[in-house]
Amino acid sequence: MAGARNSLTDVPGVLVGHHHVLDDDATVGSGAATGCTVIRVPGGAVAAVDVRGGGPGTRETDVLDPLNTVRRADAVLLTGGSAYGLAAADGVMRWLEENGAGIPMDPADPSRVVPIVPGAVIFDLPVGDWNIRPTAEFGYRAAAEAAVDFERGTVGAGVGARAGAIKGGIGSASIVLGDGPAAGMTVAALMVANPVGSVFDPRTGLLWGAGTDGPATFGLTPATPEQLAVANALPVKGTILNTTIGVVATDAPLDTLAARRLATTAHDGLARAIRPAHSPLDGDTIFVLATGTATAPEAPPLPPAFPTDLLVLDQLCTAAAVCVERAIVDAIRSARSIAGIPSYRELFPG
């Protein structure tokens, strides 16, 4: 079942903050329409990442390789602005440093810390003025605003997002596992949907990501012929770069190898919700944050060649893919039209 908020912050200790600029009269090519989103974990969390798109824009992803030394991250940045937007991470680091968060590097001076802030970008530069993109100040403000409750849709990193021919945005979903090896643990996702691919079936208007749960779960019904004619006549998204990015969080006690496997499997949800996914024109990237606050149940005996948390991880992986799929559905349904880019709920109001 879903968590209390059906959001990433159903995982205890995970906070989300946005900062964006959006002019009411923004168009494709003019005005302000971009932003960033920060996922902050006070005390840090085991972190991993899986990059599957052909055109990624990332920061500090190498540090999350399980072969490398650092095991934890303090925050994750999701941002618009393409590669320029990575500057927002400087502001996130500044806020964390001011608040004593990061790897302590000097036992004699606790203020000497190095915050670990991996991040990824979407390409939203054509929406609004090309020269208006997230700066360090955006990241600082988003980190400061991070809280349990947050908005979805056309906010933060989702302001300039487009999903194929329609408006993209930010969405979230969570699952609290009720039984099995991972009973009582929570898995959740937050996704920024900005793919070159389509998020809805041109034959029915139903979202691809509603397939696992069924359209009725989301209150969706097939579109009318008139609605389909309008939606299918929209011009194909013509940008060279695009990208869907996000974060999966869990309270499970995972090591970096298990977290990496969780990130890998989470991409299955992305592939269910977007067609095509992981294209040469997308930089699809999913981070994982594992806080480890949940208690792992006693594991059944397994052959010594297997990790002891194998069955727990298997259940978490299944849930992560579903959360990503649902979060993308939430992003599309929550988005509102800006800059002349129609939203899903505007095209299919039924």
Regions found by a protein language model. Name each.
Residues 1-90, 94, 98-350:
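A structural signal for small-residue-enriched, beta-sheet-centric alpha/beta enzyme cores
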